[in-house]
């Protein structure tokens, strides 16, 4: 029963379309109709600016964190990372936004933060360093996933390794168009770093 309750809560948390809410409430803009059309932090940064993008990033991280922290607080008999994955699914396929969501990078990070804060710090550091060097958000997301997968070896936790593998695969798959644009030289670079 715990899996059903916390799984549903996690999916619904993940389904909260932060970018859509910030865009409509703060700017009277449906972010899905601009830029990449993606309901994520990167599109929000590009279309609405740093303040809105930062709010969406933090909100998306919080969704993943809450999904993993709540079962721990209630001492639920569940595999917490499996529950966290449902928040990631909710972010990608949100019931509150016609199942058209984001790429789940921030929500995945938040999920890890709720269980493995040190791994989260390593992920953020990897992301920012790669972003500083490459100026590509998509490439930074992919490299962060792959580095995180390598680092999970040190945790000697098979479940964590499987979940991080799944998250890395999801991130790579969700960025397949970005990968094509990087190869073609048409992927937008950031200019603020």
From Swiss-Prot:
Membrane topology: Multi-pass membrane protein
Pathway: Lipid metabolism; phospholipid metabolism
Compartments in which it is found: Cell membrane
Primary enzyme class: transferase
GO cellular component, one term: plasma membrane
SMART domains: G3P_acyltransf
Record-level GO BP terms: phospholipid biosynthetic process
Domain of life from the UniProt record: Bacteria
Catalytic reaction list: an acyl phosphate + sn-glycerol 3-phosphate = a 1-acyl-sn-glycero-3-phosphate + phosphate
Coiled coil spans: none
Keyword Protein transport on entry: no
Cited function: Catalyzes the transfer of an acyl group from acyl-phosphate (acyl-PO(4)) to glycerol-3-phosphate (G3P) to form lysophosphatidic acid (LPA). This enzyme utilizes acyl-phosphate as fatty acyl donor, but not acyl-CoA or acyl-ACP.
Name used for this protein in its record: Glycerol-3-phosphate acyltransferase 2
Organism of origin: Oceanobacillus iheyensis (strain DSM 14371 / CIP 107618 / JCM 11309 / KCTC 3954 / HTE831)
């Amino acid at each position: 029963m715990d899996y059903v309750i916390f799984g549903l809560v996690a999916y619904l948390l993940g389904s909260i379309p932060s970018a859509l809410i910030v865009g409509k409430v703060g700017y009277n803009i449906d972010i899905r109709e601009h830029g990449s059309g993606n309901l994520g932090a990167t599109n929000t940064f590009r279309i609405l600016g740093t303040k809105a993008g930062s709010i969406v990033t933090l909100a998306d991280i919080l969704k993943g964190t809450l999904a993993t922290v709540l079962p721990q607080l209630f001492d639920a008999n569940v595999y917490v990372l499996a529950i966290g994955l449902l928040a990631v699914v909710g972010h990608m396929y949100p019931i509150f936004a016609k199942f058209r969501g984001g790429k789940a990078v921030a929500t995945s990070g938040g999920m890890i933060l709720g269980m493995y804060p040190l791994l989260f710090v390593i992920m953020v550091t990897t992301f920012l360093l790669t972003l500083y060097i490459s100026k590509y958000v998509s490439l930074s997301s992919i490299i962060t996933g792959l580095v995180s997968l390598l680092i999970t070896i040190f945790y000697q936790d098979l479940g964590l390794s499987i979940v991080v593998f799944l998250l890395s695969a999801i991130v790579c798959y969700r960025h397949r168009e970005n990968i094509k644009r990087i190869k073609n030289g048409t992927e937008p670079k950031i200019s603020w770093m």
